[in-house]
A protein has these predicted regions:
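Structured, active/binding-site neighborhoods that engage oxygen-rich ligands
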Residues: 1-207
């Protein structure tokens, strides 16, 4: 029988596998071009050749994109949060730590996310411009402004709903107590850290 922990792990691993499957064709905008490269049905298996990357030492492995990286940093932010009210700020700090891995910028006493020590989470995997731009503003003490409707918010917020199912009631609102609105609100706020158009953060609340 599968435990709740098994299901949460399966959700995160399944998302990472799907990301690794689609990453090689993320920037191929024609299905015809995908068919030329992978056959009539398109890409149906993990591509381990990594011909689209410069990281030749990784050939033989399927790699994840910035989507999985940011998903795991969301999870780390949730784990670091002491209370539900603190979670938004903890997630933002986690995103800033991810930002540092992508830009090679340095900041003292900014070391809450142990996962950034994982080599694959330090590699630059086509990070979205909106995420980098918004986090750069926050990093430099400026308010972020954009009108982005992109999917960069929703692609990383699954851990909020997953973790809310196991956090104790005195630490965080539990979904099983029918307080789904609080989880929806936090998911929207996490997406709004970088994507400020309503269509950039509202889908995260409805995910």
């Amino acid at each position: 029988m599968y435990t709740l922990q098994d299901r949460i792990r399966g959700s995160l691993i399944g998302g990472a596998i799907g990301d690794a499957l689609g990453y090689p064709v993320e920037f191929i905008y024609s299905f015809g071009e995908i068919q030329k490269r992978y056959g009539e049905r398109g890409i149906t298996r993990l591509d381990t050749r990594q011909h689209w990357l410069d990281e030749t030492e990784q050939v033989g492995k399927a790699v994840v994109s910035d989507d999985t990286q940011m998903t795991l940093f969301t999870a780390c932010g949730m784990l670091n949060a002491g209370t539900f009210e603190d979670a938004k700020y903890s997630i933002c700090e986690a995103y800033l730590e991810w930002f540092l891995t992508q830009t090679q910028k340095k900041k003292k006493n900014f070391n809450q996310c142990w996962i950034k020590k994982v080599p694959e989470l330090n590699e630059r995997r086509a990070p979205g411009h909106t995420c980098l731009s918004a986090l750069n503003d926050i990093f430099n003490g400026r308010e972020s402004f954009n009108n982005s409707k992109g999917c960069g918010g929703i692609m990383r917020t699954a851990p909020i709903a997953l973790y809310s199912a196991v956090w104790s009631d005195d630490a965080m609102t539990n979904c099983r107590n029918n307080n789904v609105k609080d989880v929806m609100k936090l998911s929207a706020e996490a997406a709004d850290i970088t994507h400020h158009h309503v269509l950039g953060w509202l889908p995260s609340a409805l995910e």
